[in-house]
């Protein structure tokens, strides 16, 4: 539940979870902190009073942690104790909920496991924690975790959950059980399906004033039996016999970190009957229930799954001009890690999307990885009260602009160079944006093919280039002279659809110049508008000048016979 996470976040924030403090004046810091406090209060009220998840738990946790970091940065008092105040109900737990300490990695787990025996691992089921109180064999109370000491009395709703036995016998007849109410799933793969807001659905069903049909879909995973049988095996078998079979089915003894890691990976990728967000590792023997206190469960820890999404801050916005003149927006981010990948920037897309999202520096955004591990911006979570929005370029760019390295053309010019060095054109190894920018700036490239005229000695003068690197690069550049005519036409940026290059059999520049619109339309993917563009492109003065320069370099297909 959120309350335990909230208490842990105070410690994390003070330990430097967000190392960089914002560059704010004291007055601005007070305004921003107050605004975020108000937003968190609204989320808390929706969650605790109405059972509504306005944001995911991951988003909430991140923003709560961000608030604590800002308060620490500017030595501001903590006024918002909404999670504690709202979560705490009026019904005291017979045995307090301790919560679990979250470990960051295998190294931390190894340190915790050192010297311990009789260890067990369980899926960390993602639901809502409760206490079940049985007296004389009958269900007496079901209490929400709340602040760990007190919670809400959910007994009336719990009696409508078929998965909760109303009567038990034997050692369970007078017992206190702690577990997770969860939304039952069929074949849920956490790695693929994510959290699906399962926790919010459970909380909502339990907090409604009317009986919800969702209660029929709830189940219960018992993860603690304070003062029950001392041996873990005995507790699990008694629970299973008494109508709580899941703990026995999903509790596995472990002896090493590798044992835990194997099951963690297995449960992350394989189909399960519940949503999970990690694994829990616990000692088989637990202290007496009277000693349990919130935040003091030293005998149990959690190792969560890598987050599918992260909240981070936009540090800067950059406008990039592509080779065809289209302007896109790239956000520089406070670095975060997703699936072992460090993410420090994300493409926003077009100017229109940037304007629709209303993004500015300082905004808190949610980031995930799309297909092939490409960072993706999913949502704007928080906007500061004072926002900085950069002004986009005013110059007009198109498919024919910036063939020459003139002032104001730097971005599109470099984009053209990066494109022609790709596999689909010249396939120049090691020629990324940084290298092209370095060469262009140092050697003052006049146009798109100026690099072809560089000598080995000239390349040696490039800052950071060794003699070996210069020789290798010159050799690559020189080999492009042997590339077929079509590759050079592609490098010029001729706007011909990709599927039509094979149908184009021309191998002389003069042949392309001789084509009229009707001739171009004989190619399968070229219509009237594209034909007009092609004729205009080939006869543009800048293109004609570059073709003449390539002819002077005796590039095949351009040189006159």
Curated annotation (Swiss-Prot):
Q: Is NAD found in the keyword set?
A: yes
Q: What class of enzyme is it?
A: ligase
Q: Which GO terms describe its biological process?
A: DNA repair; DNA replication
Q: What is its EC number?
A: 6.5.1.2
Q: What keywords would UniProt list here?
A: DNA damage, DNA repair, DNA replication, Ligase, NAD
Q: Does the keyword ATP-binding apply?
A: no
Q: Name one GO molecular function term.
A: DNA ligase (NAD+) activity
Location of the active site: 124
The UniProt catalytic activity note for this protein reads:
NAD(+) + (deoxyribonucleotide)n-3'-hydroxyl + 5'-phospho-(deoxyribonucleotide)m = (deoxyribonucleotide)n+m + AMP + beta-nicotinamide D-nucleotide
What family is reported? Answer: Belongs to the NAD-dependent DNA ligase family. LigB subfamily.
Question: Can you name this protein?
Answer: DNA ligase B
The primary gene name is ligB
């Amino acid at each position: 539940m959120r309350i335990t996470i909230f208490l842990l976040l105070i410690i994390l924030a003070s330990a430097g979870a967000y190392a960089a403090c914002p560059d704010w004046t004291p007055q601005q810091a007070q305004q921003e902190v107050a605004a975020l406090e108000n937003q968190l209060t609204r989320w808390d009220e929706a969650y605790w009073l109405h059972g509504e998840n306005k944001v995911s738990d991951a988003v909430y946790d991140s923003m709560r942690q961000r608030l604590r970091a800002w308060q620490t940065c500017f030595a501001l008092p903590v006024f918002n104790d909404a999670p504690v105040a709202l979560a705490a109900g009026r019904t005291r737990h017979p045995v307090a909920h301790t919560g679990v300490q979250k470990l960051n990695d295998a190294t931390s787990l190894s340190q915790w496991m050192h010297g311990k025996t009789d260890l067990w691992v369980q899926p960390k089921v993602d639901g809502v924690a409760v206490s079940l109180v049985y007296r004389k064999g009958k269900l007496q109370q079901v209490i929400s975790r709340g602040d760990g000491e007190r919670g809400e009395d959910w007994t009336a709703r719990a009696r409508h959950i078929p998965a909760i036995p109303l009567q038990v016998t034997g050692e369970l007849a007078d017992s206190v059980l702690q577990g997770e109410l969860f939304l039952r799933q069929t074949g849920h793969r956490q790695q693929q399906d994510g959290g699906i807001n399962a926790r919010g659905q459970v909380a909502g069903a339990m907090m409604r004033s009317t009986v919800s049909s969702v209660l029929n879909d709830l189940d219960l995973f018992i993860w603690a039996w304070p003062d029950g049988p001392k041996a873990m095996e005995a507790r699990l078998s008694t629970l299973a016999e008494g109508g709580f079979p899941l703990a026995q089915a999903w509790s596995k003894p472990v002896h090493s970190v590798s044992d835990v890691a194997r099951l963690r990976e297995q449960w992350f990728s394989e189909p399960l009957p519940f949503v999970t967000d990690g694994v829990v590792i616990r000692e088989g023997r637990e202290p007496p229930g009277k000693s349990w206190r919130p935040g003091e469960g030293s005998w149990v820890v959690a190792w969560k799954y890598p987050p599918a999404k992260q909240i981070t801050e936009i540090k800067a916005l950059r406008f990039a001009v592509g080779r065809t003149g289209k302007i896109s927006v790239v956000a520089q981010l406070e670095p975060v890690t997703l699936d072992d990948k460090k993410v420090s920037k994300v493409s926003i897309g077009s100017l229109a999307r940037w304007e629709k999202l209303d993004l500015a520096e300082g905004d808190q955004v949610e980031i995930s990885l799309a297909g092939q591990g490409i960072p993706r911006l999913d949502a704007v979570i928080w906007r500061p009260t004072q926002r900085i929005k950069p002004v986009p370029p005013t110059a007009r760019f198109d498919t024919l602009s910036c063939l020459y390295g003139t002032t104001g053309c730097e971005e599109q010019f470099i984009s053209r160079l990066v494109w022609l060095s790709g596999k689909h054109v010249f396939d120049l190894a090691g020629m990324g944006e940084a290298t092209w920018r370095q060469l262009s700036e140092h050697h003052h490239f006049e146009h798109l093919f100026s690099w072809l005229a560089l000598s080995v000695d000239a390349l040696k003068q490039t800052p950071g280039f060794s003699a070996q690197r210069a020789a290798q690069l010159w050799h690559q550049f020189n080999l492009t002279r042997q590339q077929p005519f079509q590759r050079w036409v592609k490098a010029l940026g001729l706007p011909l659809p990709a599927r039509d290059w094979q149908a184009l059999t021309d191998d002389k520049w003069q042949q392309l110049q001789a084509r009229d619109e009707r001739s171009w339309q004989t190619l399968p993917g070229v219509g009237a508008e594209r034909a007009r563009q092609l004729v205009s492109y080939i006869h543009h003065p800048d293109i004609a000048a570059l073709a003449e320069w390539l002819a002077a370099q005796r590039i095949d297909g351009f040189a006159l016979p």
